[in-house]
């Protein structure tokens, strides 16, 4: 280690939304911006140009407001329609039942990064990008990070906020291959319903449509989870054939699907491994990657950042990291369990699916159950 005067308090590896939110929150909690370092392999311009759609919960909006990263261009979700294809029964979660302006919001990754980058800049946070961490050495009093330009950055604590982890593999890590691939695109419909999101369970996996205003005011962000071989077929179809397949899977609640953007895909799996050592900890995607059903991955990561910032604001010490691990167990366990159960329970065929479809209708009549699910989706386990 170098002289402690040159050692920063917290190095955050990964300047995605979760890493930047943590940095801005640490500054908000009183840590000097010059004592916080953000390290990322991407240039800021590359991150800002990312067109992916992301879902933010109402709780995440509150966090962004606190650090001056809200408002941003986003479409509000007022209600969520949940159904099972081919079976009776559906459930509706509505903002009017929960005294909030929206259940959540749909925005583009680049819009969120732009806002968070501005918050970090105003806080005077040190940003090192593009740069990769090629190695690390943990000492009793800190961690030395080796960067790809040959330099060394010394920190009291290191937070892995994206990608791999520094800590040892947790023997209780939960991994799962869903044998599903998510096909993503932006699509337009002939008769949209403003501010309504859909979660439609099919034999191969969930199909989500999230309202996202485009130039025609009729656009949705599509996340369609299917078997890998089906995903390959969908990617090869021309636009007309793709829209026809989508209409068959979703139904006619929004009229006809009239246009689609280019499509992309990514493999789905569960990897919940919140690895940690005395001076390193993983949050966000480095701690858990979830199935996209219910859109909880980023929001769970932002809750990680909020709790960690609160604790490290009391001191950048191993004791605070240990307390963080304990404090996040319940929310992580419930959110991971909920998304995993939903992804697996509604995929498949057979008589059980009819019962599951009917269960949505029963669920819709039980106000306390709907309220609990909405609370978990907006704020996590508090």
Locate each region found by the language model:
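Beta1/beta-strand and adjacent pyrophosphate-binding region of the FAD-binding site
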Residues: 3-16
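Conserved N-terminal helical subregion
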Residues: 5, 75-170, 176-182
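N-terminal Rossmann-fold NAD(P) dinucleotide-binding loop
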Residues: 19-20
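Glycine-rich FAD pyrophosphate-binding loop
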Residues: 25-51
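N-terminal FAD cofactor-binding segment of flavoenzymes
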Residues: 48-85
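Conserved FAD-binding catalytic core of PHBH/FMO-like flavoproteins
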Residues: 157-254, 258-263
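FAD/FMN-dependent oxidoreductases across multiple families
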Residues: 233-300, 306-318
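C-terminal helical "tail/cap" subdomain of flavin- and related membrane-associated enzymes
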Residues: 309-382
């Amino acid at each position: 280690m170098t002289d402690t005067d040159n050692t920063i308090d917290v190095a955050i590896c990964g300047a995605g939304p979760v890493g930047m939110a943590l940095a801005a929150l640490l500054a908000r909690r009183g840590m000097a911006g010059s004592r916080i370092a953000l390290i990322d392999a991407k240039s800021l311009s590359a991150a800002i140009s990312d067109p992916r759609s992301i879902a933010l919960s109402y709780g995440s909006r509150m966090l962004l407001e606190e650090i001056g990263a809200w408002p941003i261009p986003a479409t509000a979700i007022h209600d969520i329609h949940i159904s099972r294809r081919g079976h009776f029964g559906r459930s509706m979660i509505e903002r009017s039942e929960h005294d909030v302006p929206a259940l959540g919001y749909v925005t583009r990754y680049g819009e969120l990064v732009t806002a968070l980058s501005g918050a970090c800049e105003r806080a005077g946070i040190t940003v090192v990008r593009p740069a990769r961490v090629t190695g690390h050495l943990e000492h009793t009093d800190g961690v030395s990070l080796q960067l790809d330009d040959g330099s060394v950055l010394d920190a009291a604590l290191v937070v892995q906020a994206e990608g791999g982890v520094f800590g040892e593999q947790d023997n209780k890590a939960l991994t799962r291959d869903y044998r599903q691939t998510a096909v993503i695109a932006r699509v337009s419909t002939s008769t949209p319903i403003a501010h309504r999101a859909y979660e439609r369970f099919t034999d191969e996996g969930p199909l989500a449509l999230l309202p996202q205003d485009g130039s025609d005011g009729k656009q949705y962000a599509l996340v369609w989870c299917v078997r890998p071989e089906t995903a390959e077929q969908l990617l090869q179809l021309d636009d007309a054939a793709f829209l026809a397949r989508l209409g068959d899977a979703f139904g006619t609640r929004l009229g006809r699907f009239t246009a689609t953007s280019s499509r992309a895909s990514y493999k789905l799996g569960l990897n919940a491994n919140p690895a940690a050592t005395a001076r390193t900890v993983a949050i966000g995607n480095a701690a858990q990657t979830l199935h996209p059903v219910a859109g909880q991955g980023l929001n769970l990561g932002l809750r990680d950042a909020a709790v960690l910032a609160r604790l490290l604001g009391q001191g950048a010490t191993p004791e605070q990291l240990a307390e963080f691990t304990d404090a996040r167990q319940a929310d992580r366990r419930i959110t991971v369990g909920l998304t995993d159960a939903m992804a697996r329970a509604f995929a498949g065929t057979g008589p059980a699916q009819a019962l599951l479809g009917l269960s949505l209708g029963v669920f819709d009549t039980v106000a306390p159950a709907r309220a609990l699910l909405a609370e978990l989706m907006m704020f996590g386990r508090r």
